[in-house]
Amino acid sequence: MTRRQAREQAFTLIFEKSFHPEITVEEMISMAVEARYLQTDEFAVLLAKTADEQQPEIDSIIENNAIGWKKDRISRVSLSLLRLALCEMLFIEEVPTNVSINEAVELAKLYASQEDAAFINGV
């Protein structure tokens, strides 16, 4: 699995977690593996778990930098992608910042709109 595919998998887990905050990332992964629609990838699991564990800090950064936007007004797709990018930028040292931003923007173009991609790039 490529890094981009792993990020996409992590994004899916982070996005799904936004609908089910009571379920742990580990439980979500286990259910997905049992249903056979997810092959686990070590990097994807690391990203999803770290984003979940560090969500309060990540969300605080989003709120401080999304000028004119409250977190609850940001779409779940954009919020999940921002969480993914900030997780990589802050907690995964091997990934350059510009790569994290670019990957989140590219995923936004795939799962959201050009406007969402521009918003993510701006934050």
Feature roles, as predicted:
Residues 1-123:
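N-terminal interaction/assembly modules
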